[in-house]
């Protein structure tokens, strides 16, 4: 009889070590992969000085960026532009979604000094708009909502003119408590991603629930009717265009005013494969449909991610 796998606290489990403990076994690391089309090829910047400067600033304060931890394809562009999405509550997620490259495991307790470190780093970088996200922390009673609130408070105290967007997890089973924690320090934009269509949730987002996520977005909007709510979807995981359009309508029906839609990219052979590459023309069609549905802003394109040019998204600029 085999010995049950036991995770060590503070250890990052990635790739095969992570996906081997996902309940739904649907990944064959030896399968043939789709060839990337021309429109999915990235041009790297000639200089990496700005990129290294941001990375070093993060390391110096013991902070993390989702750009690095999730292997975002836009890292070079965003870092070279002088922007980054900060990831609080550590770099180990309690979930093990097979599309995501963030490490899974038993995370360490939250760093009580992180809000101040974050505020000082943002001040040093002279940012005017910042996105703060986190790993899932199902191990915490409030799922990390209180820490989000403390981070927003600290950042605003040192950077009074900054605009803050938070990209939050679903606060599983603690939505009411989480929103109560956020009341004293609300963001300028509230973002929570649905990721994909409900039919594929068991395969793509084990541990999550489509209706929970809609409830979170809806109830935040009921409490803060004047704060924009935002959500994002990945395409190319086996969903149909009709299903995506229905999710977009569900978002509008629950008060969401900002949408991001981008192509899913497989971080490694141990993650879910790309089912298809969606051409740019289809993203344009999704954006047109989003505008017809009444979204105030829709960023739709192959490389669009939730926080990709988030400052431009918030100001109503075209992002694709």
From Swiss-Prot:
GO molecular function, one term: lipoate synthase activity
Catalysed transformations (reactions): [[Fe-S] cluster scaffold protein carrying a second [4Fe-4S](2+) cluster] + N(6)-octanoyl-L-lysyl-[protein] + 2 oxidized [2Fe-2S]-[ferredoxin] + 2 S-adenosyl-L-methionine + 4 H(+) = [[Fe-S] cluster scaffold protein] + N(6)-[(R)-dihydrolipoyl]-L-lysyl-[protein] + 4 Fe(3+) + 2 hydrogen sulfide + 2 5'-deoxyadenosine + 2 L-methionine + 2 reduced [2Fe-2S]-[ferredoxin]
Source superkingdom: Bacteria
Top enzyme category: transferase
UniProt EC number: 2.8.1.8
Gene Ontology CC annotations of this record: cytoplasm
NCBIfam families: lipA, PRK05481.1, PRK12928.1
Identification of the protein by name: Lipoyl synthase
Protein's gene: lipA
């Amino acid at each position: 009889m085999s010995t049950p796998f036991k995770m060590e606290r503070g250890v990052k489990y990635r790739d095969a070590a992570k996906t081997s403990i996902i309940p739904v076994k649907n990944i064959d690391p030896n399968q043939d992969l789709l060839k990337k089309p021309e429109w999915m090829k990235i041009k790297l910047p000639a200089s990496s000085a700005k990129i290294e400067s941001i990375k070093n600033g993060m390391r110096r304060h013991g902070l993390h960026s989702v750009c690095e931890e999730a292997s975002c394809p836009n890292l070079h562009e965003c870092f070279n532009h002088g922007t980054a999405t900060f990831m609080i509550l550590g770099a180990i997620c309690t979930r093990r979604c097979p599309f995501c490259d963030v490490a899974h495991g038993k995370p360490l307790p939250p760093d009580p000094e992180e809000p101040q470190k974050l505020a000082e780093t943002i001040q040093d970088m002279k940012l005017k708009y910042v996105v703060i996200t986190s790993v899932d922390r199902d191990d915490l009673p409030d799922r990390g909502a209180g820490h989000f609130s403390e981070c927003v408070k600290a950042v605003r105290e040192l950077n009074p003119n900054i605009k803050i967007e938070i990209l939050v997890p679903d606060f599983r089973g603690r939505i009411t408590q989480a929103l109560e924690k956020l009341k004293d320090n609300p963001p300028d934009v509230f973002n929570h991603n649905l990721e994909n269509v409900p039919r594929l949730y068991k395969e793509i987002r084990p541990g999550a629930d489509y209706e929970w996520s809609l409830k979170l977005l809806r109830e935040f909007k009921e409490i803060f009717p004047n704060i924009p709510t935002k959500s994002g979807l990945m395409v190319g995981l086996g969903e149909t265009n009709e299903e995506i359009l229905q999710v977009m309508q569900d978002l509008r029906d629950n008060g969401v005013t900002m949408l991001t839609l981008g192509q899913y990219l497989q971080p490694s052979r141990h993650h879910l494969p790309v089912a298809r590459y969606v051409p740019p023309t289809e993203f344009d069609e999704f954006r047109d449909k989003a505008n017809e549905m009444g979204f105030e802003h829709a960023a739709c394109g192959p490389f669009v991610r939730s926080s990709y040019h988030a400052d431009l998204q918030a100001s109503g600029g075209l992002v694709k």
